Amino acid sequence: IPAAYEVPMSEGLPCFWQKLTEGRKRYDFTLTPLAGGAENEFNLFCVADPQCQNTTNIARFNNETVPDIAAQVAASTLPCYGITLGDIGWNTENTDYTNDVFPLMKKAMQMDKVGLPLFQLMGNHDNKVIAVSKNDYTVAHDIAAQRNFEYIFGPVNYSFDRGNVHIVAMDNIIFPSHKDYSLGFRDDQVEWLRQDLSYVPKDKMVIFCVHIPMRASNNQNVQAVLELLKPFAEVHIMSGHTHYAENNTYDSHYEHVHGAACGAWWHSTINTDGTPNGYAIYKVKGATIDNWVYKATGFDPDFQIRLYRGSDIF
């Protein structure tokens, strides 16, 4: 999606893709110019790990997270966009919940509810559970595991522009099975990213969205991806997965590991490190992130830290 054009919407979610049909060579699309041209300033909402396993979890997401995001969008004077950072659903070793959960989560995240175009990104728990041993794993298994997600939400690797920013979303999970998944990128993904970034001016900021934190890992093709990002003036990596908050810097990259919207898997209202359930809001100005805040669900944006006396009983 070019920076100076609206995000096309369908069924309440961004719709920038079409399913390919064998034998069809032409795919048409329409772009609508933004009234004021490309936006020099905007807010980007990053929502990690809704991780809803059942209707009880979805009800909490609908009643807590969704209206909280909508209220922040309504209070903003800037254009607002959003992206999830994976684990929208929650598969388990023996049961695949994603067929039931995905359609309900798609409804929960529509623009008329959250107030902004909310792009989607795949996490390890969004893969379809396929019975295959790690030794028998092939690229075909990894691709097959992402088909349920693609059917509901669209591609797992894509990019779009807003303002002077190039935003990339990628599936960084190698998925032989529910237990054996690992951080990494297939060779074809690295080549796709290389081609994608070849069209992006080096003075643009790149926001690179994945599920599993990168942390300068030596896992499959991670270093190759980081090398592709290195030439850009400012790079922010947005990730989730951990259910705790963390910040990492390496090379010219700043990685934001986000606390989960579901906290500790909807068992309470906090993550495993005590961070409240929530999401992040980034204020983008030109080709830099001017400011950001972790927005705790149900609290004012100024609510950022709380200390307890260690000798007290709670």
Predicted regions and their residues:
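N-terminal active-site segment of His-dependent metallophosphoesterases
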Residues: 6, 11-14, 20-96
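Short acidic, glycine-rich surface-loop motifs adjacent to enzyme active sites
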Residues: 197-217
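Alpha/beta-hydrolase fold active-site loops
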Residues: 42, 80, 157, 164-165, ...
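Metal-dependent phosphoesterase/phosphodiesterase active-site architecture
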Residues: 9-20, 26, 48-51, 66-71, ...
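Extended active-site neighborhood of metal-dependent phosphoesterases/phosphodiesterases
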Residues: 93-194, 198-200, 223-238, 247-284
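Active-site glycine-centered loops adjacent to acidic/histidine catalytic or metal-binding residues
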Residues: 49, 86-87, 123-124, 211, ...
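Residue-level marker for buried hydrophobic side chains located in beta-strands
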Residues: 44-46, 82-84, 120, 208, ...
